[in-house]
Every structure is written in structure tokens, then in C-alpha cells.
């Protein structure tokens, strides 16, 4: 027998860690690392794992789910009997005399010792407590979907900030080259002006262009700092060190589909949450309807009622009773009817909200698809524009080499090339971020896998 007990205990110790690991893995699935691996960026994956471990919003969402689980246990407790011990000890001082009909009891002083064990149980004839527990379970489903929505929002927001940081960094490096070139142009134009070969307007225009580029650089540095600060908060880091990120030239991102079935919205947490809320509201209506019915409570107590310490557990002090107590609120001033109507209207609101969420979900998916198509088309045009500018600059270099144009013309052509590169960088990152927007719109599923569509 002892061997069997030891075997059972050991098996429990083996099973419990596995169960705990499953819970962790289930939460880690909310991050959906398989999707983020489509970007082929180990730095991003590492940041996502740090988010999972440290982000405070994710922890708060997890705690809300745990609260909902405890509410289920609270509702389940109402389906079980209640037991309590309500003992008392008192010293009784009676008046001069106590009259019971013809019997007169003179004044006296005595101890009263009462040691009862009380129990009660509400008979769930109408299933009200059972429905309350089902309602609590629906609330847990809502909390779980809200937690999943938080994961999708936080990871998508971080990824968007991450690639915006990549964009700002690439734009900043490219703009540094533009500013260096523009400073050289200003210096050469100033020499031409001093030599009487250029008007003052030409020099002022070049200086004005340089000032504009320097203002753009200040804006980029500000945006870079703001993005870095926001990402530090998301990662729950205490330092303001620069967030590590990949380079622009190594970017990879998934291909987006041309169209998606409307059934893809079934994965969205807001839709699942609104569906669970509508079901919960329906259960609450049924619960409120049962408030009109009587309740039946079984009760009883078992214990001792003695007057002397040395006779507490004597046979004659034993006390026990049991019974059933029907309870029916005949008039409450319309409170129960008002509560029923409130829950009924809440149910109707929940149904309307669910139908609205369906339409909103379809709209957001379609909007995200339009965004991906638009950014892809803009990227194609940006690439085409950049290629044309490359050809123009190559032509400008050939003209300079054969003496058909000045060095200033060749440098201005190079500036235009880098300016076009700026637009190309922005269009590329916009296309990357549109893939993240689509991921968010479809409910955090990997849309690159056909089985999810």
C-alpha cells in the first residue's frame, strides 16, 4: 500500500510540470512566432520573446484571465453546501423573577455555552446557480480572447515601430549623404558667386535647400528617439539604450494574398469575444428570469448547548435539527422586473454589437488588403522611379566625363538620386508595415498558410 502511495505521488510530480509547460506554451502561441519567422529576422524574434517575458500589458491581460478563472470557482462554490461554526459563550443575569404562566422563576445567574456546527444548501431546482456558473465560464472565454487581442496588438505595434525604426535609420544615413553633397554644392556655388559666375539667387537657393535637408535630419532624429523610447517601454526595459534592429538592405517580408475569404474573420479575437458576450448576456437573462421563482434552502445544525463547562459534551446537551426553508420575494418594488429588463436589453445590445463586429471585421480585412495592394503598387512605382533616376544620373556622369556638363550638374543629379532613394526606402517600409496591418486585421493568424485562409 505504501509503495502505491509513493508511486502516485511521483507520478503527480511528473505530470504537474508538463501541465505547467503546456500553459506556458499556450501563452507563447499567442505571440505566433511562426508568422514572425516569415520576416527572417532573428533580432525581431528575440525582441518578441522579450515582449512575452516582460511586457506589462501582457501580464495585466493574463491576470484578468486568472481573475475570470477565480470567478468560475466562486460561482461553483454557490452550488455546494455551506458549513460554519458559530459558537458562543455568555453569562446570563436574569431579572428579579421570570414568569411562565403560573410558574415563577426567581432571579438567577448562569453560563450559556453554545457549540453548534451549522450547514445550509440551496436546492438548485431551477438551475439558477448552474446558469451562473456557465455565465462565469463565458466571461472567462471573453477574458481569454481579450488577452489574445492584447498579444496581437502589442506584437503588431512593436513590429510596426521596429520597421519604422529601420526606415528612420536608413533615411537618416541616406540623408547624411545628401547633406554632405549639398554642402559641397553650396561651397562650389559660393566660389562661383565670388568669381562673378553665379547670381546671388542661385547661392541663396542652394543654401535654402541645405537648411531644408538639415531640418529634415532633425525631424528624423526626433522620430528615431521617440520610436526608441516607445519600444523600450514595450520591452519593459529601464534603460534608454538604442534598440537593436536589422539593416534596410537585409529586409525580408511575407507575400500578401490578392484576396481573402470572409471566413477569415472567424479567427479575430474581437469577433469571438463579442460572440461569447452575446451568449453570456443570454444566460444572464435566463438567470434574471429565475429570480421570480421561489428558493428552497436546506438547513441544519449539530452541536452542544450546555450551562456548565464540565457538562459540555454530556448526552443531555446534544443539540441537532434540520429542515427546509422556502423563500419567495413576493414584492420588491419592481426591482426584479427592472433587473430582468436590464439584462434583456443588454442581450439585445450584445447581439447588435456582434452583428456590427462582423461587418467591421470584414471592412478592416478589406481595408488591410487594399493597403497592401496600394503599398505594393507604390513600391513598384518607387522602384521604377529610382531606376529611371539611376539612368539619369549615369547619363549625367557621362556628360560630365566628356565635358558636356559641370561638376555642379553632376552633383545635383546625385542629390536627386539620393532623394529618390529616400522615397524608395519609405515605400519599402510602408509595404512591410502593410503586411503587419493585414496580420492584425485577420486576427493574428499566418495568412501565408493556405490552411488558415
Residues covered by each model-derived region:
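Outer-membrane beta-barrel architecture
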Residues: 73-74, 118-120, 287, 325
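Periplasmic alpha-helical coiled-coil/stalk elements that build and connect Gram-negative outer-membrane
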Residues: 138, 145-261, 371, 375-378, ...
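Bacterial N-terminal signal peptides
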Residues: 9-17
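Bacterial Sec-pathway N-terminal export signals of envelope proteins
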Residues: 19-71, 249-279, 330, 358, ...
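Acidic, low-complexity, intrinsically disordered peripheral segments
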Residues: 31, 423-453
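Small/polar (Gly/Ser/Thr/Ala-rich) solvent-exposed segments
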Residues: 59, 82-109, 120-149, 272, ...
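Sec-dependent signal peptide recognition
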Residues: 3-9
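Hydrophobic, lipid-facing positions within transmembrane beta-strands of outer-membrane proteins
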Residues: 47, 113-119, 260, 320-324
Amino acid at each position: 500500500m505504501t509503495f502505491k502511495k509513493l508511486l502516485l505521488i511521483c507520478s503527480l510530480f511528473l505530470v504537474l510540470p508538463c501541465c505547467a509547460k503546456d500553459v506556458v506554451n499556450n501563452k507563447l502561441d499567442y505571440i505566433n512566432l511562426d508568422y514572425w519567422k516569415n520576416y527572417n529576422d532573428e533580432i525581431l524574434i528575440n525582441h518578441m520573446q522579450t515582449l512575452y517575458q516582460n511586457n506589462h500589458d501582457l501580464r495585466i491581460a493574463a491576470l484578468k484571465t486568472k481573475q475570470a478563472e477565480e470567478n468560475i470557482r466562486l460561482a461553483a462554490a454557490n452550488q455546494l453546501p455551506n458549513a460554519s461554526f458559530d459558537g458562543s459563550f455568555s453569562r446570563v443575569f436574569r431579572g428579579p423573577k421570570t414568569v411562565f404562566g403560573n410558574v415563577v422563576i426567581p432571579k438567577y445567574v448562569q453560563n450559556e455555552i453554545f457549540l453548534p456546527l451549522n450547514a445550509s444548501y440551496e436546492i438548485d431546482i431551477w438551475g439558477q446557480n448552474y446558469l451562473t456558473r456557465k455565465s462565469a465560464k463565458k466571461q472567462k472565454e471573453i477574458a481569454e480572447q481579450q488577452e489574445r487581442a492584447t498579444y496581437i496588438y502589442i506584437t503588431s505595434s512593436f513590429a510596426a515601430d521596429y520597421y519604422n525604426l529601420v526606415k528612420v535609420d536608413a533615411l537618416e544615413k541616406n540623408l547624411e549623404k545628401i547633406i554632405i553633397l549639398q554642402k559641397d554644392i553650396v561651397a562650389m556655388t559660393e566660389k562661383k558667386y565670388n568669381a562673378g559666375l553665379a547670381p546671388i539667387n542661385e547661392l541663396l537657393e542652394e543654401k535654402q535647400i541645405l537648411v531644408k535637408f538639415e531640418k529634415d535630419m532633425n525631424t528624423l532624429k526626433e522620430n528615431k528617439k521617440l520610436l526608441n523610447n516607445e519600444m523600450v517601454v514595450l520591452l519593459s526595459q529601464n534603460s534608454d539604450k538604442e534598440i537593436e534592429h536589422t539593416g534596410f538592405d537585409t529586409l525580408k517580408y511575407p507575400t500578401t494574398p490578392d484576396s481573402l475569404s470572409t471566413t477569415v474573420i472567424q479567427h479575430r479575437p474581437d469577433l469571438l469575444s463579442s460572440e461569447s458576450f452575446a451568449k453570456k448576456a443570454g444566460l444572464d437573462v435566463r438567470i434574471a428570469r429565475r429570480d421570480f421563482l421561489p428558493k428552497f434552502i436546506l438547513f441544519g445544525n449539530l452541536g452542544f448547548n450546555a450551562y456548565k463547562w464540565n457538562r459540555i459534551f454530556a448526552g443531555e446537551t446534544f443539540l441537532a435539527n434540520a429542515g427546509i426553508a422556502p423563500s419567495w420575494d413576493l414584492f420588491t418594488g419592481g426591482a426584479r422586473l427592472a433587473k430582468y429588463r436590464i439584462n434583456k436589453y443588454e442581450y439585445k445590445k450584445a447581439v447588435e454589437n456582434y452583428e456590427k463586429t462582423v461587418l467591421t471585421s470584414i471592412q478592416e480585412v478589406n481595408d488591410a488588403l487594399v493597403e497592401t495592394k496600394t503599398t505594393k503598387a507604390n513600391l513598384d512605382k518607387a522602384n521604377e522611379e529610382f531606376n529611371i533616376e539611376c539612368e539619369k544620373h549615369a547619363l549625367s556622369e557621362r556628360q560630365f566625363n566628356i565635358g558636356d556638363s559641370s561638376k555642379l550638374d553632376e552633383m545635383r543629379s546625385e542629390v536627386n538620386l539620393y532623394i529618390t532613394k529616400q522615397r524608395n526606402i519609405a515605400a519599402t517600409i510602408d509595404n512591410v508595415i502593410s503586411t503587419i496591418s493585414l496580420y492584425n486585421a485577420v486576427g493574428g493568424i499566418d495568412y501565408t498558410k493556405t490552411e488558415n485562409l
